[in-house]
Regions:
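Flanking helices and flexible, charged tails adjoining ferredoxin-like Fe-S electron-transfer domains
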Residues: 202, 366-375, 398, 402, ...
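N-terminal Rossmann-like dinucleotide/flavin-binding domain of flavoprotein oxidoreductases
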Residues: 414-462, 574-600
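A short helix-to-beta-strand connector/capping loop
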Residues: 307, 439-446, 482-485, 559-561, ...
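Rossmann-like dinucleotide/flavin-binding elements
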Residues: 379-405, 447-461, 469-478, 482, ...
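Flavin-dependent oxidoreductase catalytic cores
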Residues: 1-383, 387, 392-403, 411
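Conserved acidic residues
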Residues: 56, 160, 247, 309, ...
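Short beta-alpha connecting loops at secondary-structure transitions
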Residues: 259-265, 286, 309-310, 416-424, ...
Length: 678
């Protein structure tokens, strides 16, 4: 019985005036639907699907209480009855699906990407070009009143509660920290004064909404910035928030300006649950822990160890809206696990795009991307069991088509089998597990160790042929590129060929960074070891330092090799990496003493090493044992022309279609959408 396997996770939580059906919280995540035409109808479908999937309680993306509090100009806000009316379609859909939902009230303060931003003090954020206006007493009172008004409107719109965003370096958090609050009145100075705003907001919201309405306070328990809160201050605030009327306290980890990763795939699972655990017993209301909890096993362990009363998972419910139901039914092996990549969610959010999910392109597209049963069954051949081919084959089979999936390798995965070997990308093992199960459950006829040719496919009598044949690494025209010390990235990551102690990596795209990460690590990656991760990034394991970092020196492991990461382009090395993860990869490699060079001309490779010229300077030689080529790839389309000439219906997807950069997000999306239309 699954209930026996996850007794803590699936246990109801009695909040006094209402009961949550289990201990899962779908954490707040801005989707971009909030501001789009027809967005509320799409939000209704998005949240209702997750309510049907069994989530105990959901929280919307951040909604500003006023214009100045929006994360950017035109950001969604809730300050009028007219705006509240638009939300009713969301709450009604969630309740009809058996769920509960809270609205998050988020005031960005000095993080607002707008010249209208306000803050406790006129101190500019390091991640924002705008300097905030310092609020006067009347201005502070207005902000509090706007929080209260927003909560009242949320209640009228049918929400079961609100989450007051008091962490991540936003407005309320800015009042709490001395380095952003330099006021000398009753809103600044002592910690009792600095926490006054948070307490007043919770207290006045409770007074306005009455006792039978959920109030979650998102409390920053680990700021990860030098001038952050001490643990004594965090305890003081938690007690005051409880006294003011909060129903639940949610854990916030890290300010947005912090230079320590908190949710990326390099972060160990449940890396910060022990932070929440330290607050257990200090307050009597339930505590929610968060960050990198992505499987029912991890969630159950966190709860069983007493770290928290609930677990918050945001991205895992993007990846699989049926996460809870599958766990409860004993089908956890069918869960499409969040890999923590950020590529289609947070990178999209910060790029002004609609949020989705690399492993589930239906996320936030529930009203237009659906895998409906077919009217006429087709025989479909898919060639290539990489990300694109797996998505196409399983979606087509799920819809009812008869699908045969061919691959010349002895296992599915394609480029996933390369990615999973990179330290910090171990979550790809979960994606492979998911697809293996999906291939089995949808009835795909999987034929591994099978290379097909045009005639084989023509003779097969298929109605549709999908070529997901992938790529081949490109070999650049460098004198000596055939030298024995030259390896491709597939030689290193897939074939695991021996590599010397000094290595030059040619090409600083995503693959070049992955290879460099692989080369500098030895033994267990810190992504698999919570304590080692904390030490590597300079987090106080005792939680005694201010902000969790003051005076703590980072202790990265010594690199296994000396690595030079090179690129021809003049731009910053790694400039093309993800918006929310690129800095993590660059910092991680710098901590491993990787030398990154741009504007590099490759002159030749010989016994002495790699001869280069940097920025049109004098020629020099990098004395290295090996040179690893990560200079792009070419599409493998050898079957296409013959099949077209034979009159077959042929579709190219994944790297076989566009090989400029390996992109699992595009591959899975493309494969899924094609299969949904066939």
């Amino acid at each position: 019985m699954a209930a026996d396997r996850y007794p803590h996770l699936l246990a109801p939580l009695d909040l006094g005036f209402t009961t949550l059906r289990n201990r899962t919280l779908m954490g707040s995540m801005h989707t971009g639907l909030e501001e789009r035409p027809g967005g509320f109808e799409r939000m209704a479908a998005y949240f209702a699907e997750r309510a049907r999937g069994g989530v105990g309680l959901m929280v919307t993306g951040g909604i500003a209480p006023n214009d100045e509090g929006g994360v950017y100009s035109g950001a969604a806000k809730l300050s009028t009855e007219e705006e509240a009316d638009k939300h009713r379609i969301v709450t009604e859909a969630v309740h009809a699906a058996g769920g509960k939902i809270c609205l998050q009230i988020l005031h960005a303060g000095r993080y607002a990407y707008s010249p209208r931003q306000v803050a406790p003090s006129a101190i500019q954020a390091p991640i924002n070009p705008f300097k905030p206006k310092e609020l006067d007493e009347a201005g502070i009172e207005k902000q509090i009143a706007d929080f209260v008004n927003c909560a009242v409107l949320a209640q009228r719109a049918g929400y079961d509660g609100v989450e007051i965003m008091g962490s991540e370096g936003y407005f309320i958090n800015q009042f709490l920290a001395a380095h952003t609050n330099q006021r000398t009145d009753r809103w600044g100075g002592s910690y009792e004064n600095r926490m006054r705003l948070a307490v007043e907001i919770v207290s006045r919201v409770r007074g306005a909404v009455g006792p039978n309405f959920i109030i979650i306070f998102r409390l920053s328990m680990l700021d990860l910035v030098e001038g952050g809160s001490t643990w004594d201050e965090i305890e003081l605030l938690a007690k005051a928030i409880e006294q003011a009327g909060a129903t639940l306290i949610n854990t916030g980890i890290g300010w947005h300006e912090a230079r320590i990763p908190t949710i990326a795939t390099k972060v160990p699972r449940a890396a910060f649950s022990k932070v929440t655990a330290k607050l257990r017993g200090v307050v009597n209301i339930p505590l929610i822990t968060t960050n990198r909890i992505n499987t029912p096993e991890v969630a159950e362990t966190v709860l069983a160890e007493g770290d928290a009363d609930m677990v918050s998972m945001a991205r895992p419910f993007l990846a699989d809206p049926d996460f809870v139901n599958k766990a409860a039914a004993g089908r956890a092996d069918e869960i499409n696990t969040c890999i923590g990549c950020n590529q289609a969610c947070l990178d999209h959010t910060f790029g002004g795009k609609l949020t989705s999910c690399l492993v589930n392109p239906r996320a936030c597209h529930e009203t237009e991307l659906n895998y409906l049963p077919v009217r006429a069954v087709k025989r479909i051949a898919v060639v290539g069991a990489g990300p694109a081919g797996l998505a196409a084959a399983t979606v087509a089979a799920e819809r009812g088509h008869t699908v045969t999936l061919f691959d010349g390798a002895n296992e599915i995965g394609g480029q996933f089998n390369v990615a999973k070997r990179v330290p910090g990308k171990e979550e790809f093992f979960e994606t492979l597990r998911y697809f293996r199960k999906k291939v089995e459950s949808t009835g795909v006829d999987l034929r591994l160790n099978t290379r097909v040719n045009v005639q084989t496919l023509v003779d097969g009598g298929y109605d549709e042929i999908i070529l997901a044949t992938g790529i081949a690494p490109r070999t650049p025209a460098i004198p000596g590129v055939e030298h024995a010390k030259v390896l491709s990235y597939l030689d290193v990551l897939l074939e695991r060929k021996p590599v010397g102690k000094a290595v030059a990596v040619i090409g600083a795209g995503g693959i070049g960074f992955d290879v460099s990460e692989y080369l500098v690590h030895e033994g267990l990656a810190t992504s698999q070891d919570r304590e080692a991760f904390w030490k590597e990034w300079g987090i106080d394991t005792q939680l005694e330092a201010r902000g969790g970092v003051a005076g703590i020196k980072a202790e990265p492991h010594a690199p296994a090799r000396q690595v030079f990461l090179l690129q021809r382009k003049k731009s910053k090395v790694g400039d093309g990496l993800g918006k929310t993860t690129g800095w993590i990869h660059r910092t991680g490699l710098k901590n491993k003493r990787v030398q990154m060079l741009n504007s590099v001309e490759y002159l030749g490779i010989d016994d002495a090493g790699l001869h280069i010229r940097v920025c049109e300077g004098e020629p020099q030689v990098l004395v290295v044992d090996n040179v690893v080529i990560c200079a792009g790839q070419e599409p493998l389309r050898g079957l296409q022309d013959g099949l077209v000439a034979a009159g077959q219906s042929v579709h190219l997807i994944g790297g076989a279609d566009v090989a400029a950069e390996l992109d699992a997000k595009r591959a899975i999306n493309q494969g899924s959408r094609l299969a949904a239309e066939l």
